A protein has these predicted regions:
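Catalytic cores of the polymerase beta-like nucleotidyltransferase superfamily
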Residues: 1-167
Length: 167
């Protein structure tokens, strides 16, 4: 189960450490703490914003307090939705639910920005199109064509992993 919160990694560890059967912190610098409670595994990530250097797909991470800012950094609108708890209220600032209903694949921000920031998202787009039958928007297709050369900054292992998921 993936959760996002305005709590910092230190606050997450302090709150859940005493009740966790296991707790792992490999992703802590990106704001992610893993927790196992009983037979359930949770990844809890602090809301964040990211910025990228032009020659890297590794983000500079800044923790935030607003889930909407966190959703803006997601790869596609269908992944940029959240349920606000304890009352289940859908937070959908980029109309991901409508895109899901229309089988449409779109990025929350301009696709050129999204694919420049993280070129691996172009391969993820291919996987979502093939695996879920989503139809890409014309601007997404144009951005993939224009940014295909950016895949050179992605490690071969990451490309292989994404192609394995595609197949």
């Amino acid at each position: 189960i993936d959760l996002t919160t305005d709590a910092t990694p230190a606050q997450i560890k302090a709150a859940l450490g005493p009740i966790a059967d296991a707790l792992w912190t490999q992703g802590e610098r990106f704001g992610t703490i893993g927790v196992k409670v009983g037979d359930r595994v949770f990844e809890i990530t602090t809301h964040r914003a990211e910025s990228y250097a032009p020659d890297s797909r590794k983000p500079e991470v800044a923790f935030g307090t607003d889930v909407r800012d966190d959703l803006a950094r997601r790869d596609f609108t269908v992944n940029a939705m959240a349920l606000e708890l304890p009352e289940p209220v859908l937070v959908d600032p980029f109309d991901g639910a409508a895109d899901l209903a229309a089988n449409r694949l779109r990025t929350p921000l301009a696709p050129e920005v999204s694919f420049t920031d993280d070129p691996l998202r172009m391969l993820r787009a291919a996987r979502f199109i093939a695996g879920y039958g989503l139809e890409p928007t014309a601007d997404l297709v144009d951005a993939v064509r224009a940014n295909a050369g950016r895949l050179e900054i992605v490690s071969g292992e990451r490309i292989r992993d994404e192609l394995d998921k595609l197949l």
